[in-house]
Amino acid sequence: MNFIKENSQALIQRMGIVVIKQICDDLFALNVLNGEEVAIICSHRVEQDAARDIVHMILKKGSAACNLFLKSLENWNYPVYQDLTGHSLFHQNLEEDLDVLAQSLKDLYNSPVFKNFFPLGEDIDIIFNLQITFTEPVLWRKDHRHHRVEQMTLGSLLEALKSPCLIEGESGKGKSTLLQKIAMLWASGMCPALNQFKLVFFIRLSSARGGLFETLYDQLVNIPDSISKPTFRALLLKLHKKVLFLLDAYNEFHPQNCPEIEALVKENHRFKNMVIVTTTTECLRHIRHVGALTVEVGDMTEDSARVLIREVLINELAEGLLFQMQESRCLRNLMRTPLFVVITCAIQMGSEEFQAHTQTMLFQTFYDLLIQKNRRRHSGGTSGDFVRSLDYCGDLALEGVFSHKFDFELEDVCSMNEDVLVRTGLLCKYTAQRLRPTYKFFHKSFQEYTAGRRLSSLLKSREPEEVSKGNSYLKKMVSISDITSLYGNLLLYTCGSSTEATRAIMRHLAMVCEHGSLQGLSVTKRPLWRQESIQNLRNTTEQDVLKAINVNSFVECGINLFSESISKSELSQEFEAFFQGKSLYINSENIPDYLFDFFKYLPNCVSALDFVKLDFYGRATVSQDKTGENSSGVHTEGPSTYIPSRAVSLFFNWMQKFKTLEVTLRDISKLNKQDIKYLGKIFSSASNLKLYIKRCAAVAGRLSSVLRTCKNIHSLMVEASPLTTEDEQYITSVTDLQNLSIHDLHTQRLPGGLADSLGNLKNLLKLILDDIRLNEEDAKSLAEGLRNLKKMRLLHLTRLSDMGEGMDYIVKSLSEEPCDLQEMKLVDCCLTANSLKILAQNLHNLVKLSVLDMSENYLEKAGSEALQGLIGRLGVLEQLSALMLPWCWDAYISLPNLLKQLEGTPGLVKLGLKNWRLRDEEIRSFGEFLEMNPLRDLQQLDLAGHGVSSDGWLSFMDVFENLKQLVFFDFGTEEFLPDAALVRKLGQVLSKLTLLQEARLTGWELDDYDISVIKGTFKLVTA
């Protein structure tokens, strides 16, 4: 009694309201205080008043009550008890023990047992060293709405640390190594933000048992004997924020096993120690409400992934993997998750034949790790229940892929499976700031893998019901564009999971190509007119272009499926049926290893391809072949060449022949003898060779040497590449040539060159001369040569200037005798009225013409008469599908006669009346014509250079919207201010032309409001 009375002042000042209430609870349970007394004490708002009441009450109750009071005080506030009894906790010896404990922790954090860890679990004997493999993480601070608000580094996190700090992230994001790194930084003494902490404890919550003291003793170091459990407890209270707890994996923590650690997190205000705790996003909901700072671990940067790979793998393996990362966007995306970097490195360590583009292997390893690690957490069900849960997860993923769904609601996840799927890590559960939980696979690609794994198991099942279910999914894939864009990864992982599934898939894809939708791609998704110039596309229908693009991507998809399946020659027959008649594009700068496997194991499939395209670019390389290269595909020695030996190895070492090989040489400034020799080896693999040369200064004087190596060349194109007279002469000596295109050749023609000798190419079917320097004498020579080209089906003469009246001779030579010419373009080529008269007189000799393009030609003298004469003879061209006419100053007066002739060409696809200066009267006549004779197949309409008013265009709009196949139109003019009514109407009409890809309204004075009304998914050109 005397002790309490003597120390009453200190007790009243130091006990604190929390300790007072805890002592009240103890004394009430021991019948020292009754309920009324407890209520009086606890009713005080000022803690000193409460302390004063309890001290006075205890003193009145005698010695026994005083002893019980002191015992309770010792339990709940040991430092105060020690101070009052004269036994100060922090005497010199205990300070020394504290220093010993801190040093022991630092020694632990600097030891190999702490730095070395098993990134894939202790069952897999692969060890990483944290000292050299740790990379700077990307961290995001989140606000109370759970939104990212600020990117942080580890350093800025430690400087702004608040307790408790919650670090969230999905499996494999590197949360554990982050906490270990903090412990190591503290032990090093090199981090100022951590030097404030006297003690730092790293605790794995998955194995936390008993109390906090026992857990630390079990997991970390031996605590000095002089520090008892009560002493340690008091120590934590005394040191307050000088102690940091690093609590790893709250998602694997069982609070009932260690209530004291649970209180350390959720009642941190009592302990006042600093706490950092990591957890998965799904389990964050259990502690988010107590967090003072919430941080998310973001994606790993590509640079960090590269650093980790270099530290983990030996140089040769690291360089190979880094090269594959550079070439594969998908692999780079996967490497944003540290665990995938680890898995990739681990697989690389164990397999010399590992190819990182085999993504199935990565996901399969990850999937198996999740199941292996978390299966023990499944309780309350049989093994069969667990397997059924995994099947259900696969079904969920499959349905999501086909319904384009990657976020799932509660009703999507069966209640009996939800716990299993979340606990195993296959599904992530998001609850933060959501009324109802959302479920996701941690990565879209992982959902596609899970779906592919399930589809594979269905297709190879021995149960007819499951096989039927798998086939029902395949039957949903009927569009090539959907297969390559929406379902490409699903098929990739399905083929990577089993050979039997690959067989079923390839049979289905072969049928899709034969009977399915070859188009199936909306124009809005792939703006083709923006990918290539309109001039290149005007000869091709929209459907043909889409078909070509889709089939090319389909072939790439097929090769990827072959590579992923690792079936080698086992499915040769199924793959051949798929590749039959298709084309393949190869970039010589990036020839992947799997193409060598494709040529090696499926030579019959390569031979089945109708067309193979190979491009070479003007960047010198060093020798690089399949067997002698380093893992990045590049030798460190060998002569510099423009033709990579890797391409030679692929084509020349293959013993069969391509049906058609197209080789493009682009931007090459130099060709040495070795390059030409290499080209000859590549050319020899083709039964039919097409050679395209673009912007290659190197061919001047060497083209003849290149052509001498071409034994089966049937097509040659030269663009913006200088030619000598010898080169031109050699071109005309290749008598098997069927297609010849010369573009942008501005050097003066010399005697004996191309114009003089063109007639030697008697097998020529297609001739294109574009932007070539020709004078009138050259044109006369060219005309003589054209007379001998009896087999020619296509002729383009475009952008030819300074020919004087040379076109008269050319037109006469083309038309004076019956011929099989089907397409003739005479664009911007000095066409005269006399040329037009000659053509009109001889048009009966060109009855097979389907394309007649004479645009960009101004007829000066007697132009109107010549134009009307030609129009009057158009009726003999029964197969006409494209008509682009020249112009003269009064061309519009010819419109009535033209419309009368067009009544006999309902299948017209392209019509061009550029610079005809159409007026309101003519545009109304044209509209009336379209009402009576709808050109349903019209894709291109060029009425540029008109004089139509807003009223005239308004009268035309109703019939204009019926041109449903329209892809391109040009209504450009000069200084035209459209009425608001016209703009609104035009916007409505264009919204109905769903195939439209380009609209040209140059000269229309449109403001932002007008453009907002008119614009759509097509390209709008106004200037």
From Swiss-Prot:
<dbReference type="InterPro" id="IPR027417">
    <property type="entry name" value="P-loop_NTPase"/>
</dbReference>
<dbReference type="GO" id="GO:0061133">
    <property type="term" value="F:endopeptidase activator activity"/>
</dbReference>
<dbReference type="Pfam" id="PF22524">
    <property type="entry name" value="Nlrc4-like_WHD"/>
</dbReference>
<keyword id="KW-0597">Phosphoprotein</keyword>
<dbReference type="InterPro" id="IPR011029">
    <property type="entry name" value="DEATH-like_dom_sf"/>
</dbReference>
<dbReference type="GO" id="GO:0043065">
    <property type="term" value="P:positive regulation of apoptotic process"/>
</dbReference>
<feature type="modified residue" description="Phosphoserine">
    <location>
        <position position="533"/>
    </location>
</feature>
<dbReference type="GO" id="GO:0006954">
    <property type="term" value="P:inflammatory response"/>
</dbReference>
<dbReference type="GO" id="GO:0010954">
    <property type="term" value="P:positive regulation of protein processing"/>
</dbReference>
<dbReference type="InterPro" id="IPR040535">
    <property type="entry name" value="NLRC4_HD"/>
</dbReference>
<keyword id="KW-0547">Nucleotide-binding</keyword>
<feature type="repeat" description="LRR 5">
    <location>
        <begin position="786"/>
        <end position="811"/>
    </location>
</feature>
<feature type="repeat" description="LRR 4">
    <location>
        <begin position="761"/>
        <end position="784"/>
    </location>
</feature>
<dbReference type="InterPro" id="IPR042220">
    <property type="entry name" value="NLRC4"/>
</dbReference>
<feature type="repeat" description="LRR 6">
    <location>
        <begin position="823"/>
        <end position="846"/>
    </location>
</feature>
<dbReference type="Pfam" id="PF17889">
    <property type="entry name" value="NLRC4_HD"/>
</dbReference>
<protein>
    <recommendedName>
        <fullName>NLR family CARD domain-containing protein 4</fullName>
    </recommendedName>
</protein>
<feature type="repeat" description="LRR 11">
    <location>
        <begin position="964"/>
        <end position="984"/>
    </location>
</feature>
<keyword id="KW-0395">Inflammatory response</keyword>
<feature type="repeat" description="LRR 9">
    <location>
        <begin position="910"/>
        <end position="932"/>
    </location>
</feature>
<dbReference type="GO" id="GO:0070269">
    <property type="term" value="P:pyroptotic inflammatory response"/>
</dbReference>
<feature type="repeat" description="LRR 12">
    <location>
        <begin position="998"/>
        <end position="1020"/>
    </location>
</feature>
<dbReference type="GO" id="GO:0043231">
    <property type="term" value="C:intracellular membrane-bounded organelle"/>
</dbReference>
<dbReference type="GO" id="GO:0016045">
    <property type="term" value="P:detection of bacterium"/>
</dbReference>
<feature type="domain" description="NACHT">
    <location>
        <begin position="163"/>
        <end position="476"/>
    </location>
</feature>
<dbReference type="GO" id="GO:0042981">
    <property type="term" value="P:regulation of apoptotic process"/>
</dbReference>
<feature type="domain" description="CARD">
    <location>
        <begin position="1"/>
        <end position="88"/>
    </location>
</feature>
<keyword id="KW-0433">Leucine-rich repeat</keyword>
<dbReference type="GO" id="GO:0005829">
    <property type="term" value="C:cytosol"/>
</dbReference>
<dbReference type="InterPro" id="IPR001315">
    <property type="entry name" value="CARD"/>
</dbReference>
<keyword id="KW-0399">Innate immunity</keyword>
<keyword id="KW-0067">ATP-binding</keyword>
<dbReference type="GO" id="GO:0051260">
    <property type="term" value="P:protein homooligomerization"/>
</dbReference>
<dbReference type="Pfam" id="PF00619">
    <property type="entry name" value="CARD"/>
</dbReference>
<feature type="repeat" description="LRR 2">
    <location>
        <begin position="655"/>
        <end position="678"/>
    </location>
</feature>
<dbReference type="Pfam" id="PF05729">
    <property type="entry name" value="NACHT"/>
</dbReference>
<keyword id="KW-0963">Cytoplasm</keyword>
<dbReference type="InterPro" id="IPR007111">
    <property type="entry name" value="NACHT_NTPase"/>
</dbReference>
<dbReference type="GO" id="GO:0005886">
    <property type="term" value="C:plasma membrane"/>
</dbReference>
<keyword id="KW-0677">Repeat</keyword>
<dbReference type="GO" id="GO:0006915">
    <property type="term" value="P:apoptotic process"/>
</dbReference>
<feature type="repeat" description="LRR 10">
    <location>
        <begin position="935"/>
        <end position="962"/>
    </location>
</feature>
